[in-house]
Amino acid sequence: LTNTDIVVLKERAEELQKLIERCHEILSDEGVLKSLMKSELREVKKNYAVPRKTEIKDEITEIKVDLKDMIPKEDVIVVVTNDGYIKKVPMKSFKAATDETTLKPGDFVRNMFELNTRDYILSFTSLGNYLFIPVHTITECKWKDLGKHISNLIMIKENERIINSFIFEKGTSLVLTSKEGMIKKVRMEEFEVSRCSKPMTSIKLKDNDELISVQKEGKKTLIITDNNYYLLFETGEIPEVGPKASGVKGYPIKDNNVISSSQINDSDEYINIFTNLNTAKRVKLSELVELTRNKKGKEIIKKNKTKDYRVISAFTSNVRTINVIKTNDDVNEIKNSDIPIMDSNSFGSTYTKLKVVNVKPKYEFEKIGKTNEVVETPKEVEQPKEEAQISFEDFTNSFKI
């Protein structure tokens, strides 16, 4: 080694010896250790001084975490069927689909929504209950999967049916109508609950009564009974109350029941009428007489001396409406243009020879935040009216006393 190398090595040895002695001192003397820690912390504070963002407490009683923030936000499609099946489909599976979704034989889609996993769905049942369903809890399926019955999410009774479902959006009002003519209006936010594990009351019903209609508030309300009467009045006549209230009389029920209650908006042109004798017709809404709530109403089908025509289904429609006909064996669709436009005196025209179980309008695809969006509806061009063909029996019955 050169003289210079020897000097450098001796200096390095002295430095290491001093460091070893200092480390021994820190480890063996608690006072020296604390003094070192203080000086180093002061140095950190001097170089990186920022206001403290955390709070130090001796004891923390409760930590609140919003579980909704922990749910991954993902756009999905939710399908609800007439028989009460529900499924959540990823957008990728939905966009790749080329066919209709899989359903049980005789079932059909009632609602289809585009929303995200942090949203909620409101489903109303025939027994006057509602289900507040977080979308993220719905079983995820492929578009071609059947899905699960809604009772797998929230238990409902065997005889309880889902009558309508909605995307939960504050600021919207719903109109609820019962079979015995009770009616009320409820703000959608009134249905929000923190516990979603059981059905909640949406309307107080009497024995043997049931909820038959839940719709978003429209400008006018049209009630139709099974003995062929209608009542048209302003929706503003319906009071706004809470979920547990019974509401007020919308129609004076005696020996009849309300079969349909519709909310009328600017896009609606007709009321579609279907009878127990497999006849159907469309009546222009503009031809109906407007009265006030809780009146007897006017006839929507004239009385027949030999045939007991009774309305089994009725709903508002426009030129885009597709009618879903559920029979004992199958489900078929009829375009609105295939149903004749008639007046309130006519019986309608035969549209099938099969035993009809139910008739509903085909679902309209709904998106979160766009449920109140006004969609321009083309007006139907009426064909020249042909002479009505009626049987000699119906003609003579019109003159019987």
Features from the language model and the residues they span:
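Short, structured "edge-of-domain" segments at secondary-structure transitions
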Residues: L1-I401
